[in-house]
Amino acid sequence: ELTVGAEGLETVTARTTVPGSFPEFTQTYGLDEDGNRSIIIEYMKEAGSYYGANVEYRIEGENGFVYEGFAFPIEGYDEISIDNNAYSPVVTYINDKHIFVWDDEADGKYEIKFRDNTISKGVRKYRLHLYKLSEEMYRKLNAEYDADSNPFAGLGLSSPSFTYSNIDNGAGWFCAYSKSISDWMIE
């Protein structure tokens, strides 16, 4: 809980819970004959929990050349999708990087699919950044997603601002997440 006050102003209060780490998980990397790549995350889901993930890549080429970044959206990756087994998944941002977000309605198995069209030759490595989100962070990310995905906002037919705040006597959000990073998977 965070409480801030000043003389002559109402006291502002916000609450969140820092979540524990992402549950123990296994990861499986796959590549089909069409060049579609996928990473399947299997974990023991916890009731009332919220999760997120993104994929980091690293291509170590000849002469020490290294090409690295996150798999969504970057030039050279033209397709990323998520398996339909995730309940209400959204794609939004944490620290300026796209992240897939889902809640505990997923069945303990989550699949991220992507196509790698980079021309770079070399050793390709992928790893997961896995997030366990507080309920406030999950609600904040969903609100941002709703605002960013609102086709009517640009037409002036609805408010372009997101509508979630967990600040009493104020506006904004106070939320938390924990992050785990998997080992590199080599193609």
Feature names for model-found ranges:
Residues E1-E187:
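A sequence/structural signal for flexible, mid-protein segments enriched
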